[in-house]
């Protein structure tokens, strides 16, 4: 900024916050620094582009000149903290760097020379320490304040004269607010809320996951000791395909906060089509190998994810051609009581391994303290090995959905299926193998899916075996380099927006590809929940297990015929998926994060 503005010397006369609403705002500005002294002739219009800065000080070389002795030659520097990149919304956030001798203050707190602090809507900026003789202070009014987490009350100013934010009423602790500001809520689940935040000192965008453990765990010393061990393990996770954990806060009242790397390219969930996939086989392979590498790394650290699903697989950046992924929410299930896990199954059952369902059934039948190995149908639900095999199953379900565009355990003839019926299909391995075989994918890809969707965990492919599967090892070597743009892997790999048939890489002369459309399963899923064995006409190379839904209904507190939350699907009224007609009912479940 080349223009220099002079602000005259003024006595101390403050303007009440209630009178600030009449101050005109230029919509082309980022915001206004509204003078809190009536003798200052004009406010400071913050017109600033990305990577530009505004200097405020006594020197004539500054953009904003304040000729007061308390103000240093170059007192502070204002930069944008909300650069618009990768599709991010502009939130009107500013970063203030203190360059002064007498101090720059935000809401009465000294920034410190050479240090920076975030300035958000409603904050008070003061040049030098306020005294009775002089007070050079401003109230920042962002033109984008309606996009921040302001409270819904008519008076957005608290007793200190600064904006009141939603998290101030949500038990978000001072330890977190010392270093981070919360911008907006990204999503919520049964036990957690995820916010987009920003580091006050650096302006770096982060994701903040808030887990309220007081609702789901005990206060025993044993649990707290285990929690500390788990936190220490998670802090040392470092992999290019795993969302980085910057910091973890744990409060005395069992509030857990994860400060996470922000992957803002959207979820894998948003690139799954309806009945026909949006990703071709080479793109699916490129993505799935990254997922396998990430899960393999976590397993090597003794961490089982336990909640793998497309919603927990994020793209690093926006764009159809940028397919680098990062998985998130790993290890969080280790902080959740097993009893609560049973409740979550009803909200996100599509990726649950058979042994998880059987384990819950076993504990309901024999009791949680049962140690009879002869009666137990599964491994210990809390063991690491158990979690690893469950992850492999979930990966198989994810790969099936990505390749086929529909979930493996679903009914072609009905949009609605009860949770017990879905569980019955899962534990019997009764997935739609004909859909997989008739889809336009290679036999090698289908073989990998079948190996992962094997009911017996001892016969199921491990993640390491999946990494060594021919479908993965034959991946183009170019996909292993550091340039993650998928266009470098093949000249013919483009995301197919909508097509009746899957398009594959034309450079791959695979004789196993079939051009026939998928055949619908003519057998309608039975609606009554009996104890009869399932129909075994379809063979998936799995060990079929008998029905147990009668007692499982009691374990999960479900009634016979109860539907999967009315099949909430991938498309809600307020949530439109990428490139998919919103009037179509997608047969997936929209599970909570």
UniProtKB/Swiss-Prot annotation:
Database matches in Gene3D superfamilies: 2.60.200.20, Transferase(Phosphotransferase) domain 1 (1.10.510.10)
SUPFAM superfamilies registered for this protein in UniProt: Protein kinase-like (PK-like), SMAD/FHA domain
SMART domains, per the entry: FHA, S_TKc
Record bears the keyword Transcription: no
Recorded GO CC terms: cytoplasm; nuclear envelope; nucleolus; nucleus
Record: active site: 307
Uppermost EC category: transferase
Keyword Kinase applies: yes
Domain FHA: 54-111
Catalysed reaction equations from the record: L-seryl-[protein] + ATP = O-phospho-L-seryl-[protein] + ADP + H(+); L-threonyl-[protein] + ATP = O-phospho-L-threonyl-[protein] + ADP + H(+)
Disordered: annotated segments: 1-24
Biological process annotations from GO: DNA damage response; intracellular signal transduction
Domain Protein kinase positions: 180-472
Keywords: ATP-binding, Kinase, Nucleotide-binding, Serine/threonine-protein kinase, Transferase
Positions with a binding annotation for ATP: 186-194, 209
CDD domains: STKc_CAMK
Cross-referenced Pfam families: FHA (PF00498), Pkinase (PF00069)
EC number: 2.7.11.1
Similarity annotation: Belongs to the protein kinase superfamily. CAMK Ser/Thr protein kinase family. CHK2 subfamily.
The protein's name: Probable serine/threonine-protein kinase fhkA
Species this chain originates from: Dictyostelium discoideum (Social amoeba)
Organism classification: Eukaryota, Amoebozoa, Evosea, Eumycetozoa, Dictyostelia
């Amino acid at each position: 900024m080349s223009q220099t503005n002079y602000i005259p010397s003024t006595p101390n006369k403050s303007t009440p916050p209630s009178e600030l609403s009449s101050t005109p705002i230029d919509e082309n500005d980022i915001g206004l620094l509204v003078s809190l002294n009536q003798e200052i002739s004009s406010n400071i219009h913050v017109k600033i582009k990305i990577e530009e800065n505004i200097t405020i000080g006594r020197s004539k070389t500054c953009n904003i000149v304040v000729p007061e002795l308390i103000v240093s030659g170059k007192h502070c520097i204002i930069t944008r903290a909300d650069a618009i990149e990768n599709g991010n919304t502009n939130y009107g956030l500013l970063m203030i760097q203190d360059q002064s001798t007498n101090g720059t203050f935000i809401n009465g707190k000294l920034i410190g020379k050479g240090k920076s602090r975030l300035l958000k809507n409603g904050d008070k900026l003061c040049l030098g320490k306020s005294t009775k003789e002089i007070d050079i202070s401003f109230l920042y009014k962002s033109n984008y304040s309606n996009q921040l987490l302001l409270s819904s009350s008519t008076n957005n100013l608290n007793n200190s004269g600064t904006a009141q934010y939603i998290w101030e009423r949500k038990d978000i602790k001072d330890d977190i607010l010392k270093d981070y500001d919360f911008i907006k809520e990204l999503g919520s689940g049964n036990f957690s809320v995820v916010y987009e935040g920003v580091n006050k000192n650096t302006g770096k965008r982060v994701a903040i996951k808030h887990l309220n453990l007081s609702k789901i765990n005990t206060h025993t010393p044993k649990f707290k000791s285990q929690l500390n061990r788990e936190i220490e393990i998670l802090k040392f996770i470092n992999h290019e395909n795993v969302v980085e954990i910057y910091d973890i806060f744990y409060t005395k009242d069992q509030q857990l906060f994860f400060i996470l790397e922000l992957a803002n390219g959207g979820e894998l969930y948003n690139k799954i089509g309806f009945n026909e996939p949006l990703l071709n086989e080479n793109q699916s392979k490129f993505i799935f190998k990254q997922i396998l590498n990430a899960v393999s790394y976590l397993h090597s650290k003794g961490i089982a994810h336990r909640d793998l699903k497309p919603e927990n697989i994020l793209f690093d950046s926006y764009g159809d051609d940028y397919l680098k992924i990062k998985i998130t929410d790993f290890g969080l299930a280790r902080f959740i009581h097993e009893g609560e896990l049973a409740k979550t199954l009803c909200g996100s059952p599509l990726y649950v391994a058979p042994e998880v369902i059987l384990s819950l059934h076993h504990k309901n039948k024999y009791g949680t303290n049962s140690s009879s190995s002869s009666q137990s149908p599964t491994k210990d639900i809390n063991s690491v090995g158990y979690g690893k095999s469950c992850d492999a199953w979930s990966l198989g379900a994810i790969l099936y959905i990505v390749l086929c565009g529909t979930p493996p355990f679903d009914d072609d003839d009905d949009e609605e299926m009860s949770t017990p019926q879905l569980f019955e299909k899962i534990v019997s391995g009764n997935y739609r193998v004909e859909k997989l075989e008739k889809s336009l994918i290679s036999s090698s890809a289908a073989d990998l899916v079948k190996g992962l969707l094997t009911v017996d965990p001892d016969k199921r492919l491990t993640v390491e075996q999946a990494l060594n599967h021919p479908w993965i090892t034959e991946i183009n070597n170019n996909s292993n380099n550091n340039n993650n743009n998928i266009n470098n892997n093949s000249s013919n790999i483009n995301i197919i927006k909508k097509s009746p048939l899957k398009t594959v890489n034309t450079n791959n002369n695979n004789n196993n590809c079939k051009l026939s459309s998928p055949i619908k399963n003519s057998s309608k899923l039975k609606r009554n929940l009996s104890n009869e064995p399932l129909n075994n006409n379809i063979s998936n190379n799995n060990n079929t297990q008998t029905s147990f839904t009668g007692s499982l209904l009691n374990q999960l507190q479900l009634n016979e015929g109860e539907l999967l939350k009315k099949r909430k699907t991938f498309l809600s009224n307020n949530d439109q998926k990428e490139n998919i007609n919103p009037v179509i009912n997608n047969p997936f479940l929209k599970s909570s994060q």
